[in-house]
Amino acid sequence: MEEYNKAVEEFRKHEYPMLKDAVYLDHAGTTLYSKSLMERYMGDMMSNLYGNPHSASTSSQLSTSRIENTRLNVLQFFNADPEDFDVVFVANATAGIKLVMDAFRCQEDGFLYGYHQDSHTSLVGVREDAVSSRCLDDDAVECWLSGSEALVRNEHNSEIGLFAYPAQSNLDGRRLPLSWPERVRNLSYEAQANTYTLLDASALVSTSPLDLSDVSKAPDFTVLSFYKIFGFPDLGALIVRKDSGAILQTRKYFGGGTVEVVVCLKEQWHAPKGQSLHENLEDGTLPFHNIMALEAAIDVHKSLYGSMECIANHTTFLARKLYEGLKSLQHANSEPACIIYSPGFSETSSNVQGPTIAFNVKNSFGAWVTNVEFERLASIKNYHIRTGGLCNPGGVASALELQPWETRRNFSAGLRCGGETDIYAGKITGVIRVSLGAMSTMSDVDSFLSFVNEFFVDHTVVSADEDGESQKSVDMYVESLTIYPIKSCGGFEIPKETAWEVRPEGLAWDREWCLIHQGTGQALSQKRYPRMALIKPTIDFDLGLLKLRYQGSTFPTLVDEISVSLSSDPSSYKNPNNIHSLSSRVCGDAIAAQTYFDHEINDFFSKILEAPCVLARFPAGGSGPSLRHAKAHMQKHQGPKRSAAIEKSSAHSFHDPPTPPDSDSENRKRPILLSNESPILAINRSSINMLNEEIAKSGGKLASASVFRGNIVLASTELTDSHHPYSEDHWSTLQIGSETYQMLGSCRRCHMICVDQDTAEKNEEPFVTLAKTRRFESKVFFGSHMCHVPSFSRHKKHQFPVIKVGDKVSIGL
């Protein structure tokens, strides 16, 4: 039954003076120690003489006696019979997990490992020592426990398994069934297998009881940290079910205090202690002062709060109020302010949700408020919370719908937990966590809700046109979108209705890879290797892969398809530690690109092009030789050209005059990847039509838009002065959909545009005709360079700029 403990309000000021002017909501990290505990501990230390428990003096024997008393108190705290359980003192829950892992990895055939997706990082890390491992969600666990599938794939004939999970998620407070250990034990008996259970009880026991009175239902191994319950001391425990303890004694390492005798000279032999499990597992001198503090902590905690059931009722009452309060916060336009990831509280059961709430905040336009912004303001106002990934990788990925390739991509882009950036590609990468403890009060909840309401809820309706985005369309639209993931190779036409991400470097995944000649270090291009046009890419977001096929004549032993991860996985490169990288040249720039070491990948390209080459990547976010900038600039032939119709049309689009060539905006360095001169290349369909009319007069082969390898083809339904052939020479800005783009200048052309992108055959057109009609100062131009202009709008759509086929286009002159 949920019940608020008013007594906490009466003693909190005296027992927790450190809370003055602070609202502490990070009890999942550690709860707070009471004044009474510290005074009692200090008095104990000042009144008694304690020696090292490995000695035989009276002071040492006193320490030993107090340690064993505390060990028994811990078992009683969890209703665990000392006949059935033993307590091993460790530094923290992570140390307990590692102790279990050390024993399991010593098994002759290794061990199989399954862990729940809500597991703390410390549980996830055990997989590195298992011969096979698997991350399971609720459904997968149920399938396994029902006998319909194995825990993990067993390719190593391992007979030992370990299943680990948290009793309560440290991320969002969700509680998992405590019935699983018994079901695992029953399943192991039926299958004549041997799978043990490891329960991470750290988050649960901070505010709720853990009852181990029924040994048949108890986990084999339970880990916890006492500072999460009492605030002090910094100590943990591994509670071992004695029937399962034999496997822990198979570990090879032994430390001081765990052996009866050791032989070093001439022979290597030792005799481990064997009277109890903990004697064999507690390496070195125990943190005996902390253990004595634990004895005091248990007593003081009971005197202040009564039972753990009372604390559970109190914190559940507060957590429900907090959850409902956050859920009810709405902006003036009725949009929710908080996106909550915790499961919440049902009317029939309060045992599915702990007093930990995970959420994020959105503004009234649906855009994410960054965790960094929220935490900074909270810190200034003296609210103590936690943000980020919370050391729960599976839980945060599930809550935020982050695919593995997205997480790896975010890492490659420089995103780190605790960093300044936590939104990438329109997705937030962390959460805000508030957690309650035994000494939390209703005033803490009310104060925090008021804080969120005051600073993150819009109480007046803000017009969607506040940024002056509404413009009159001039009847142009995006006809097609194409990216070229590998420089000079085939293009991937973006499907209609697919909103494609626009990055500072250009369209997502455009020209992020290249092929480098192993001898010269030069990036390959169609000028010398026209067959590159027939290497066709596909972006598979479901699998997180860039897939590549060759559509020309087949080569002996050539595989049909290869793929590389979209994420910048360091293990794929020749130098995974980025100590060295391959120096190359792209369009005259010296660059440092990371090369792939996979022979199948590199042989695929080398066979097709009949040249020794390697695939290399030049991902966004680099610096120094891993960073390039746009070179495009306005040409002399692109001076102002305005008719009356254009002047009228311009009045409804962009009001600012074109920037002079020496202005800051013109000279600003714009990042690019492996494109020749600019982030984005646009082609005007009416200009292609005009060009083909000229080619037809001489009987030449008409040009497809694909030979110009543009990212965007713009078309119009009406022929007006704003978008007649080559009118792009005089455009200053474009608004495509809701995003703004700045024109950077005309694109200079070479004879590579004569390569047919479907056959790889070379023709003289369209270069010959362009040389007659579009030559200025001995240079041939066709198409326009452009870049995206970031918006400072609070609107959701500007947090993740996109473009799609069919978008309307407005022109600024």
Curated annotation (Swiss-Prot):
Record keywords, A-Z: Molybdenum cofactor biosynthesis, Pyridoxal phosphate, Transferase
Domain named MOSC: residues: 648-812
Coiled-coil region(s): none
Taxonomic superkingdom: Eukaryota
Gene Ontology MF: a single term: molybdenum cofactor sulfurtransferase activity
Region (Disordered): 625-670
Pfam families xref list: Aminotran_5, MOSC, MOSC_N
InterPro entries per the UniProt record, alphabetical: Aminotrans_V_dom (IPR000192), MoCF_Sase_C (IPR005302), MoCo_sulfurase (IPR028886), MOCOS_middle (IPR005303), PyrdxlP-dep_Trfase (IPR015424), PyrdxlP-dep_Trfase_major (IPR015421)
Catalysed reactions listed for this entry: Mo-molybdopterin + L-cysteine + AH2 = thio-Mo-molybdopterin + L-alanine + A + H2O
Top-level enzyme category: transferase
Co-factor requirement: pyridoxal 5'-phosphate
N6-(pyridoxal phosphate)lysine sites (modified residues): 228
Residue numbers annotated as active site: 391
Keyword field contains Transferase: yes
Chain intervals with Basic residues compositional bias: 628-640
UniProt key word Flavoprotein: no
The EC number(s) this enzyme carries: 2.8.1.9
Gene Ontology BP terms: Mo-molybdopterin cofactor biosynthetic process
Record family assignment: Belongs to the class-V pyridoxal-phosphate-dependent aminotransferase family. MOCOS subfamily.
Function: Sulfurates the molybdenum cofactor. Sulfation of molybdenum is essential for xanthine dehydrogenase (XDH) and aldehyde oxidase (ADO) enzymes in which molybdenum cofactor is liganded by 1 oxygen and 1 sulfur atom in active form.
Protein name in UniProt: Molybdenum cofactor sulfurase
Species this chain originates from: Botryotinia fuckeliana (strain B05.10)
Protein's gene: hxB
